[in-house]
Amino acid sequence: MLAQLPRQALSRLSVLPLYGGGFWVAFTQLTVFYYAVGAVLHFVLPRIAPVKPIQHQARKRGEVLRDAFYSLGPLAVKAAIWTIVEHMHSRGLGLTYGGKVYGLAAVSYCSLCVALLDYLHDAWFYWTHRLLHWGPLYRHVHYIHHKYDTTLPPHLPPTRCHLSSRSPSAFTGYSFHLVEAAIVFANEILVCFMFPLHMGLHRCYHLYTTLIHEGGHVGYELAPFIPTLEGLMTLVLRGVRHRAPWLNTVQHHDLHHRYPTRHFSLYFTHWDRLCGTIHPSYDKDLFSYFSSSS
């Protein structure tokens, strides 16, 4: 029966284009990926995998649903930014390129691009994250992401961020203000002017960062680092038993939700260490956690 369908109908049944499909294709990609990954991380893995919680507070009823709902706005902002990148590419603005990627040289270059994107994304996230903790931006914008955290920065009055115990979940990843979304995702446009970047890699990489933001809030560790290319190479070279102190963990960001003036980075710890925003007990607590888990 499927063979009898006209070719046009079959094309409609095909997978969405990776890029070039406009806003609604981008938004569909993001929402399906975000909520599917969130469901697996929040509902499935804790039940089938030997995970050890790092949070000691129960989530209040409705918090997960609230975060899932609040994520829709930032997902739309990210889809709009992807659409801008598509229009830039079609008009020859920036350094993006298309076509097939084959051969050792092309694959090696794409791997180098991933490493560059990791370091640029981490730097952008660290400094914009610190900016979002500046008093006015925190009170009017970033407070949504920390809305029910147990601790507030000492220089801020507990006004709109009313103290109420909670632990973040996977769906907290993109649960933030639309202005924050525009700030956080702006680097996805900026990187298009920094070095030649394949459009397919741009889309896949920034779709993958969605998983990173969700995974940083799940409340348990599955690996001794946030999954990155650098983390994979470290695992190959050092083995699973040797934790790399320069790589971030879920606990790294979880501590930020308990101590909001600490831990602003995403993939790596070097900015926090250089700028004095690493928590004093982080390394010791992390060593104890993984020692007791082994």
Predicted regions and their residues:
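Hydrophobic alpha-helical segments of membrane proteins, primarily the transmembrane helices
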Residues: 25-32, 64, 112, 116, ...
